[in-house]
């Protein structure tokens, strides 16, 4: 973690900036690599070791925006390896339910069976995966580990109006078929298994064409196949810090405002240019392409300040995805701790 010096009261601004910031210049990125060795700065009086109490004081999570399927929040006081571990867990290690087996009874459409099966597998299923078990290999399907959906669509032409009926097979045509006591598992209508969206196109049909399919959903994780990933995107970026020299005023200030495609800068009443909307900055560096501005505008990112964006497929809420990722991360830490204890003992 990015720690303050504990061995003296004097801080070297250049060294502190190197430890805590990533700098972007016209020619590239400087100081991108973090230094985590505890004794890296001992010779100049900095204690770079991890301190649990200091971590507890500095660590923060601030929610910037939240809806059922989208979550944007700040995580302050952690290093990139931890942030990236959480991101990877959200993408590939949180289980969901997805169509795994497809039994094609009839398919007279022009789409090949294997392509149709693949399309069905990529439709996100709205159901809480925590209510189901992982299916064991070579075992029969049970209500505890499998969901069954029926897809039966026939395209016809109305003899009176000439209108084509069921011209497009949609995800809403996937009908859940309860087995054993599954209806008791979902007493509320809104909780019952269904495709996340009703209007996902599966395929086009012409009059007389029929598809009759049984789909079996199983629980698994995104590391096995991306169809089991609970997120559309899970990403993070570092907090931007943009500073502008006070000498930029008048016409130069207006030129700087015009250079930024995201309109990050504003001019205050005093004539001073400020970065009013730093979170909108995409680090395109257009503002420092001109040598005239390169020396007067400084673009940095805070090394331990992450802005996470999570977009759910709908199987789980974005908040639940992050909570599950934390649980899995703790389990992994416990495994490492147990392994180390075995080696030591």
UniProtKB/Swiss-Prot annotation:
One of its GO terms (biological process) is transcription by RNA polymerase I. InterPro entries: DNA-dir_RNA_pol_30-40kDasu_CS (IPR001514), DNA-dir_RNA_pol_insert (IPR011262), DNA-dir_RNA_pol_RpoA/D/Rpb3 (IPR011263), RBP11-like (IPR036603), RNAP_Rpo3/Rpb3/RPAC1 (IPR022842), RNAPI/III_AC40 (IPR033901), RNApol_insert_sf (IPR036643), Rpo3/RPB3_RNA_Pol_subunit (IPR050518). PROSITE patterns: RNA_POL_D_30KD. One of its GO terms (cellular component) is RNA polymerase III complex. Residues 1-11 have a biased composition (Polar residues). It comes from the Eukaryota. DNA-dependent RNA polymerase catalyzes the transcription of DNA into RNA using the four ribonucleoside triphosphates as substrates. Common component of RNA polymerases I and III which synthesize ribosomal RNA precursors and small RNAs, such as 5S rRNA and tRNAs, respectively. RPAC1 is part of the Pol core element with the central large cleft and probably a clamp element that moves to open and close the cleft. Belongs to the archaeal Rpo3/eukaryotic RPB3 RNA polymerase subunit family. This is DNA-directed RNA polymerases I and III subunit rpac1. It comes from Dictyostelium discoideum (Social amoeba).
